């Protein structure tokens, strides 16, 4: 079956976050994707103001019902979910995932549990329990950042071993593939650490295949949408390399780093009076990195 993704997350008119990233990246990897926009805003919320609306659970259900009524749901091979801002909407998303899995038991669910960053939540706190107890146990892949891992597991991560303990909790919830997408350790102040783990299907003594990737030097600037973009790149490369999570991460992370670097280098053309929230990822200008990816950062086994 030809890969086809249903992506349920946010959309902005200007800039690149959520589905605006995912659709671009997946299509440039040659993958069909249908977006459902859980939120539709004028721009991301780092700007001084924004306008728009959230999709209600009923309207989300209606959109999916329209796809079902026209027999368009049986061809989905993957579901990608990202930002959702209410328990009710998240429950509706989960119903959609379960419905699709009932139609296609081989369907892969990729969950980016968007909760927060930099030690803070930017969604209602009750979403944490819904993700932990209901959503994540149904996922085949999860791509949380450090803040999200700490809220979901209760483990404060200061080193590799802490990260692996948290990952073990996710595996016990039923998730086969886990990638913590950004870790910051005092021992590596100039790098971002990525740690991944997949349950080993082979009959040997190694229960998990685990690895880490050092990414650096890190950029001091903050760009919105990087996590959303990385999730879509990880999904895209997992379709190409379904049995090699470390290679998937090497490819996706290298692409993302090159895109951020392209964006960073373009700042000199931005007026000095502009605040950093105006710096949007230069996806169109960086499409060559998606289409012709070279590995920039190699993984090491843990």
UniProtKB/Swiss-Prot annotation:
Record InterPro entries: PM/HMP-P_kinase-1, PyrdxlKinase, Ribokinase-like
Essential cofactor(s): a divalent metal cation
E.C. code: 2.7.1.35
Listed Pfam families: Phos_pyr_kin (PF08543)
A GO-annotated cellular component: cytosol
Residues reported in the UniProt entry to bind substrate: 10, 45, 122, 228
Enzymatic reactions: pyridoxal + ATP = pyridoxal 5'-phosphate + ADP + H(+)
Localization: Cytoplasm
Family matches, as CDD domains: pyridoxal_pyridoxamine_kinase
EC top class named in words: transferase
Pathway membership, UniProt: Cofactor metabolism; pyridoxal 5'-phosphate salvage; pyridoxal 5'-phosphate from pyridoxal: step 1/1
GO BP terms, alphabetized: aggregation involved in sorocarp development; asexual reproduction; pyridoxal 5'-phosphate salvage; vitamin B6 metabolic process
UniProt-annotated binding residues for ATP: 181-182, 215-227
Family, similarity comment: Belongs to the pyridoxine kinase family.
Function: Required for synthesis of pyridoxal-5-phosphate from vitamin B6.
Name of this chain's protein: Pyridoxal kinase
Gene name per UniProt: pykA
């Amino acid at each position: 079956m030809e890969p086809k993704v249903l992506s349920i997350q946010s959309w902005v008119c200007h800039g690149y976050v959520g589905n605006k990233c995912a659709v671009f990246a997946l299509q440039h990897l040659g993958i069909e994707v249908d977006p459902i926009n859980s939120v539709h805003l004028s721009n991301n919320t780092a700007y001084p103001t924004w306008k728009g609306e959230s999709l209600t659970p009923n309207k989300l259900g209606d959109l999916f019902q329209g796809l079902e009524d026209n027999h368009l749901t049986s061809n989905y091979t993957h579901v990608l979910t990202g930002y959702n801002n209410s328990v009710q909407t998240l429950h509706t998303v989960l119903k959609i995932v379960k419905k699709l899995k009932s139609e296609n038991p081989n369907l892969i669910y990729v969950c980016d549990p968007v909760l927060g960053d930099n030690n803070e939540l930017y969604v209602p706190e009750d979403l944490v329990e819904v993700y932990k107890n209901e959503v994540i146990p149904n996922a085949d892949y999860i791509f949380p950042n450090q803040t999200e891992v700490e809220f979901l597991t209760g483990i404060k991560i200061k080193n590799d071993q802490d990260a692996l303990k948290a990952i073990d909790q996710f595996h016990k919830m039923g998730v086969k593939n886990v990638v913590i997408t950004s870790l910051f350790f005092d021992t590596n102040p100039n790098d971002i650490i990525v740690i991944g783990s997949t349950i080993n299907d082979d009959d040997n003594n190694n229960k998990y295949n685990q690895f880490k990737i050092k990414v650096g030097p890190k950029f001091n600037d903050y760009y919105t949408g990087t996590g959303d973009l990385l999730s879509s790149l990880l999904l895209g490369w997992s379709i190409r390399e379904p049995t090699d999570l470390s290679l998937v991460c090497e490819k996706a992370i290298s692409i993302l780093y090159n895109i951020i670097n392209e964006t960073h280098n373009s700042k000199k053309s931005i007026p000095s009076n502009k605040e950093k929230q105006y710096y949007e990822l230069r996806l169109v200008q960086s499409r060559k990195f998606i289409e012709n990816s070279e590995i920039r950062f190699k993984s090491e086994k843990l």
